[in-house]
Every structure is written in structure tokens, then in C-alpha cells.
């Protein structure tokens, strides 16, 4: 009688500890996007990489059947995949990573901060318009929460200032 009980406890612990860890393994950038972030070291161009990555998530969210040109696919890799909530979380994380890169550049007094910030804010304004149209397509609470967080992060970017 002890064996089945111990087995059940072990199984429950394994499953409950394993699932959250699995959920955290998702990377917000594709392999090609990561390569571009590593390769492009000039601040304003690196921010453009993050903008492109964020735009790709919005493209898939707005049009799940979206296609890209062969040239785009060679450069950026396949379009990102995932649930609506995952793509929105990826979008938010991309913005947060870009903000971190801007903060790092600020600490180094990078002369390109105003240019990079201007590009970032303008892109976030355009993305906000598209994000706001997605609410009608969201059916689950998890999706609505992810959308709300993505919108909040984009709004934060639009208010950003070079210090």
C-alpha cells in the first residue's frame, strides 16, 4: 500500500515542478533574430532588429496565415509560432530587452541614444494601434491578460525619454 502512495506523491511532485519549468523555456526571439541581435552592435541598428522582431509577432497575431517573401525568410528565418498569449508575451519581452539595451547604452553615454529611442518610440506607436485592434480576436482570459501587458509595455516605450 505504501508503494502506490509514494509513487503518486512522486508523480505529482514531478509533474507540478516540471510544467512551470517547461513554460519558462520559451525564448522570445527566434534563432535568426538572436543571431541578428548578436551581430548588430551599433545601438540604433540593434534597436531596429528588436523592432523587426516585435513587428513579426504582430504580423502573425493580426494575420495568422501571413506569409513572408523568400528573401525575408532567408534573412529572418520562419515567422514566429505560438499561441496568441505566447506571441504577446514574446512581444512584451522583446520590448523589455530593447529597453535594457537602451539603458546599457545610456550608462555608457552612447551618442546614438536619441536616434535609437526615436525609432523605438515611433515603432511602438504604430504597434500600439495594431495591438489595440486585437482585443476583439482574444477569447481567453490568458490572451486578454497578455494583450493588456503587451499594450502596457508598448505605452511605456512611447513615453520613454533620453535622460
Task: Identify the meaning behind each predicted range.
Residues 1-5:
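Positively charged n-region of N-terminal signal peptides that target proteins for export
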Residues 23-163:
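Long, charged/polar, soluble alpha-helical segments
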Residues 7-18:
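Bacterial N-terminal signal peptides
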Amino acid at each position: 500500500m505504501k508503494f502506490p502512495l509514494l509513487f503518486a506523491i512522486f508523480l505529482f511532485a514531478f509533474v507540478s515542478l516540471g510544467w512551470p519549468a517547461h513554460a519558462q523555456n520559451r525564448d522570445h526571439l527566434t534563432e535568426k533574430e538572436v543571431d541578428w541581435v548578436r551581430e548588430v552592435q551599433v545601438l540604433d541598428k540593434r534597436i531596429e532588429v528588436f523592432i523587426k522582431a516585435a513587428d513579426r509577432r504582430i504580423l502573425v497575431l493580426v494575420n495568422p496565415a501571413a506569409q513572408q517573401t523568400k528573401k525575408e525568410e532567408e534573412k529572418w528565418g520562419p515567422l514566429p509560432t505560438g499561441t496568441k498569449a505566447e506571441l504577446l508575451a514574446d512581444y512584451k519581452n522583446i520590448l523589455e530587452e530593447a529597453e535594457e539595451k537602451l539603458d546599457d547604452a545610456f550608462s555608457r553615454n552612447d551618442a546614438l541614444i536619441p536616434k535609437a529611442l526615436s525609432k523605438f518610440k515611433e515603432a511602438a506607436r504604430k504597434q500600439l494601434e495594431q495591438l489595440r485592434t486585437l482585443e476583439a480576436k482574444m477569447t481567453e482570459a490568458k490572451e486578454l491578460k497578455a494583450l493588456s501587458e503587451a499594450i502596457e509595455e508598448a505605452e511605456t516605450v512611447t513615453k520613454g525619454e533620453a535622460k
